């Protein structure tokens, strides 16, 4: 009996390996448009606003701006937090609001201006977060300043800046003065292109009040924004994952307030709501000594959030911004203290990003919502150890592999077109059970524009373990040209990967100037082979490429 069972296992193993040994196929049909390639990826954010105007912060922002053909939106916490502007992990401050001995307001926009000037100089746009509570306005100000250290309990950061104001009218005047100052400094047309938002994750300890107190604060804030600039855009509430009861219920209550309830300021029904925002995070963990990602958790948050917004007929066409959209929830928790975050330096992060963004678009199509943007909550951490494992796009001025996925996205525009593949997981399968089968998700996202087309490919699996490279047979159908120029780009262990180069150097803690130059070069998006001009036969091209596990490729066509 044991021998029979063993034989069955062997047969099943050989059958599964035989299935995987088949070539992966991807077929792109450029005549089948499925939606717009909305640049939802061109949104970024971070906790520490003072990094914005520091050396590596400015360098990275310049690179992000350069990779995008459209203005990039940037969201930062702590824009109204009290302090001297000294940066720290999960902390930042601007001292925008203080009071004199008689309780009169003192406005100082010096640091806020440094932050926004840095964006505007690069053609970027603020997703301007109204928060957090200045010390002089907090209803429970002490203690105020926190000193977060990786490995420390996350709850230690929730201090006096989380609480409602002791005077809502003073708060409203602060918001009014900020928007008015912004218009005076940058011009009405520029500020009309921004998005103003209130707070962050108010269903969590980030907000020390109730849901109704948040709605009250929103009404005061929205009224102040619109008094300063009637054409300004304001939204919220940036709750945590809507698939969870806490986030989902808060989102529903807030949307009901904005569409059906009495406004705390005007006494009328409803409140301005130019966009809806919620957050979505994955959930990596350690399994048998390796990192196992969970993309499904993140996609369920997105799907549920879309569904909740779509359930309000008044919000049918309202833009949706996923205000934080990431593989997990703590950017400042490195892999030394949180080993499940060891995916961040290499190709797991880049392949996850490619595969997950494609599913965000698919879920938006499914729910028929206006998907505007998805903020990648990842930036840089100034003067920290090399490749410490923070969730960042660069380390000490050197780009990580994940940034090159966004460089690829920057070359995709126009309409998304149909992609089918024999190893490509359906979007709902990834949402419901992530990528856990014996075979990887070998998929694609394709676009077509005037005179150009692009196909992004990935070889992704939740398990961060070594695997077989895939041979991918790529069929491109209904190409509207006789001849095309084809260029390929690649992110894997040998291409566009500063982390692997750093490890080959011996993982230096203080690289030399020569090594840094080499790392900077390795951090750029690399071509895969030479560009070539090819004749299209009957509107079709067929060619094969090899894609390593966790590899991401981009094929561009020009005619």
Feature-to-residue mapping (PLM):
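A short small-residue
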Residues: 144-162, 201-202, 278-286, 333-340
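Conserved radical SAM core fold
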Residues: 51, 80-83, 135, 199-205, ...
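Bacterial Sec-dependent N-terminal signal peptides
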Residues: 1-22
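Non-catalytic accessory regions flanking glycosidase/transglycosidase catalytic cores in CAZymes
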Residues: 21-195, 212-242, 267, 271-272, ...
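Noncatalytic carbohydrate-binding groove/subsite architecture in carbohydrate-active enzymes
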Residues: 211-371, 380, 384, 425-429
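Active-site rim elements
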Residues: 343-347, 389-397
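Short, conserved phosphate-binding/catalytic loop or strand-edge motifs used
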Residues: 194-200, 323
């Amino acid at each position: 009996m044991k021998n029979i069972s063993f034989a069955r296992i062997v047969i099943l193993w050989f059958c599964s390996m035989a299935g995987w040994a088949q070539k992966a196929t991807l077929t792109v049909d450029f005549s089948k448009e499925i939606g717009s390639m909305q640049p939802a990826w061109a949104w970024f954010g971070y906790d520490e606003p003072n990094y914005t105007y520091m050396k590596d912060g400015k360098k990275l922002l310049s690179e992000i701006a350069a990779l995008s053909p459209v203005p990039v939106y940037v969201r930062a916490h702590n824009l109204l937090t009290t302090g001297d502007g000294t940066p720290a992990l999960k902390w930042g401050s601007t001292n925008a609001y203080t009071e004199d001995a008689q309780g009169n307001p003192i406005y100082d926009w010096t640091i806020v201006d440094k932050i926004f000037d840095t964006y505007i100089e690069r053609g970027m746009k603020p997703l301007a977060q109204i928060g957090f509570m200045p010390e002089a306005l907090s209803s429970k100000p002490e203690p105020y300043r926190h000193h977060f250290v990786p490995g420390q309990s996350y709850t230690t950061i929730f201090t006096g800046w989380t609480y409602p104001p002791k005077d809502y009218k003073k708060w409203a005047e602060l918001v009014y003065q900020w928007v008015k100052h912004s218009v005076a400094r940058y011009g009405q047309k520029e500020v009309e292109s921004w998005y103003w938002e209130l707070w962050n994750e108010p269903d969590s300890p980030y907000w020390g009040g109730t849901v109704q107190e948040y709605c009250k604060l929103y009404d005061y804030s929205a009224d102040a924004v619109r008094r300063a600039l009637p054409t300004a855009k304001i939204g919220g509430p940036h709750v945590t994952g809507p698939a969870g009861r806490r986030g989902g219920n808060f989102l529903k209550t807030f949307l009901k307030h904005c569409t059906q309830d009495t406004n705390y300021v005007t006494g009328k029904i409803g409140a301005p709501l130019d966009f809806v925002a919620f957050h979505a995070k994955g959930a990596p963990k350690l399994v048998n000594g390796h990192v196992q990602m969970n993309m499904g958790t993140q996609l369920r948050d997105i799907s549920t959030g879309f569904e909740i917004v779509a359930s309000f007929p008044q919000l049918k066409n309202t833009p949706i911004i996923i205000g934080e959209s990431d593989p997990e929830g703590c950017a400042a928790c490195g892999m030394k203290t949180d080993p499940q975050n060891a995916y961040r330096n290499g190709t797991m992060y880049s392949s996850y990003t490619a595969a997950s963004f494609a599913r965000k678009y698919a879920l938006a199509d499914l729910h028929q919502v206006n998907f505007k943007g998805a903020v990648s909550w990842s930036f840089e951490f100034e003067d920290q150890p090399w490749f410490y494992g923070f969730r960042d796009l660069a380390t000490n001025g050197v780009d990580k592999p994940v940034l090159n996925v966004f460089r690829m996205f920057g070359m995709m525009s126009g309409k998304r077109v149909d992609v089918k593949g024999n190893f490509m997981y359906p979007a709902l399968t990834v949402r419901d059970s992530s990528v856990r089968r014996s075979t990887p998700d070998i998929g694609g996202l394709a676009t077509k524009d005037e005179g150009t087309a692009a196909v992004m490919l990935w070889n992704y699996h939740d398990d961060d373990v070594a695997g077989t490279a895939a041979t991918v047979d790529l069929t491109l159908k209904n190409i509207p040209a006789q001849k095309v120029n084809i260029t390929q780009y690649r992110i894997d262990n040998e291409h566009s990967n500063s982390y692997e180069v750093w490890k080959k150097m011996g993982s230096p803690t203080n690289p030399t100037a020569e090594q840094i130059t080499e790392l900077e070069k390795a951090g750029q998006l690399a071509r895969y082979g030479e560009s070539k001009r090819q004749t299209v036969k009957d509107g079709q091209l067929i060619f094969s490429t090899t894609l390593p596990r966790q590899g991401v490729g981009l094929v561009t066509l020009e005619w």
